[in-house]
């Protein structure tokens, strides 16, 4: 069953990659065959097998030889790992937050933003599925405020913090923000960039916070 959960997760991760790739295009998310982004040739069925196809073909198109982004391999692997973690009783709220973080991170890496309607859809899901905390209301209001007024951090980042606040205490949220900021600054200095996608750092910090024992966090 563990392997089954992992395989299902890799398939779902592949779907998340498809969503991020086709969202701003006219191509259908649910219909139509995947194709090479360079030569537009349709991919064979065996080239669509998550993880394995990318290992065998070295993340290249079999016709034109263009290299595909390794982010798809990482997305499929991480999604498979999260689904496998359900077998070990990973809390569903943590699982749901991490899964949507994968998709939002992919959008953020590609374009430093994610679609507003996706953010609104996930917001509705959290309100429907989970109890709302006071800090969640505050962060949602702050996200709406920053959507219209630039304060140096994107509304999308704050909306992600809104999602995380459903499963973290105020103290854990502060630790998460400090850790993500430190990691982001280190990345900026090492890579000598002026701008970075912040949601991947928030997501990684979230994972660390939920895995660390409460005694260490305290």
Describe the predicted segments one by one.
Residues 1-218:
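A membrane-topology feature that recognizes alpha-helical transmembrane segments
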